[in-house]
């Protein structure tokens, strides 16, 4: 449970699921070996936690969805219902895994003298880590309270940390997920072109033929999930299907656009766990 909560928090404060998973999966597996817990249960908790937190307004998926909904006519603000819904969904999945693998029956292993983790002294945060935590707190407050662009604020904070010699710039550049950035940027350009040539309208017309107001949310979740098995949720699935929501909601009648957006993101989030 603690691994899930830590993973959720790390993902929600900005890095998103991909970056947070790179940290938390390694940490959770190492911790599971020390505690005698099944590694796949701990790693699953870490993954679900990061996926739940990535839809926060300052994290990767949340930012992508916000940008897409802001372009709609009229603009939609799905941040809060999206965060609540995806958080509940992933918490339920984590609870199911916890019960299936009998996490409630786990007992602390017996340690030899000097090997018990509880005997180790706590390590204090150093100067650079404290500065980084302060920067993350400022990012959250500025973005949520003053509605400023999360990317711009993040860059400014990164520059300030660099000027304070609180970061290793070379290491920071190496840790940037360039592949993800290029994928998301490239797909954004592609989707703009697709929209201009009528591709989104064509996709919307196809979807309208196979669903009604009762089945719309289920079908969108299913299609997004299956598509997410073979492609990136953030780079492909969400930018492709979210723009179809306004026309679908108008055509079907009685369907909430926010409900459809949540369905798309939920399907993409779970489908994105595919190898």
Where do the language-model regions lie?
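Hydrophobic transmembrane alpha-helices of multi-pass small-molecule transporters
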Residues: 1, 84-202
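Hydrophobic alpha-helical segments of integral membrane proteins
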Residues: 1, 68-69, 172-176, 203-211, ...
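Cytoplasmic-side transmembrane-helix entry/capping segments in multi-pass membrane proteins
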Residues: 2, 41-50, 174-184, 241
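Hydrophobic alpha-helical transmembrane segments of multi-pass integral membrane proteins
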Residues: 2-30, 35, 40-43, 210-273
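Alpha-helical transmembrane segments of multipass membrane proteins
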Residues: 5-9, 31, 51, 95, ...
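Transmembrane alpha-helical segments of multi-pass membrane transport proteins and ion-pumping complexes
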Residues: 8, 12, 58-59, 86-102, ...
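Membrane-core helix-loop-helix motifs of multi-pass transport proteins
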Residues: 29-117, 256
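Hydrophobic alpha-helical transmembrane segments in multi-pass integral membrane proteins
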Residues: 59-60, 67, 187-205, 255-258
């Amino acid at each position: 449970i603690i691994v899930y909560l830590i993973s959720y928090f790390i993902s929600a404060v900005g890095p998103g699921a991909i970056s947070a998973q790179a940290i938390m999966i390694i940490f959770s597996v190492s911790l599971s070996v020390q505690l005698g817990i099944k590694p796949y249960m701990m790693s699953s908790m870490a993954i679900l936690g990061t996926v739940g937190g990535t839809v926060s307004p300052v994290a990767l998926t949340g930012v992508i969805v916000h940008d897409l909904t802001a372009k709609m006519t009229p603009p939609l603000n799905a941040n809060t219902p999206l965060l609540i819904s995806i958080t509940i969904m992933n918490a339920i999945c984590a609870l199911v895994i916890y019960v299936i693998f009998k996490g409630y029956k786990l007992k602390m292993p017996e340690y030899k003298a000097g090997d018990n983790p509880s005997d180790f002294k706590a390590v204090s945060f150093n100067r650079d880590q404290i500065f980084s935590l302060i920067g993350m707190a400022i990012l959250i407050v500025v973005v949520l309270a003053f509605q400023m662009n999360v990317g711009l604020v993040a860059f400014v904070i990164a520059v300030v940390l660099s000027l304070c010699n609180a970061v290793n710039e070379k290491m920071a550049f190496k840790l940037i997920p360039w592949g993800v950035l290029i994928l998301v940027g490239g797909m954004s350009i592609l989707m703009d072109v697709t929209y201009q040539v009528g591709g989104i309208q064509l996709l919307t017309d196809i979807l309208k033929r196979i669903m009604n107001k009762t089945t719309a949310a289920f079908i969108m979740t299913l299609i997004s999930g299956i598509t997410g098995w073979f492609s990136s949720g953030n780079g492909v699935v969400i930018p492709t299907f979210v723009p179809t929501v306004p026309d679908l909601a108008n055509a079907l009648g009685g369907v909430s656009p926010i409900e459809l957006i949540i369905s798309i993101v939920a399907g993409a989030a779970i489908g994105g766990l595919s190898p």
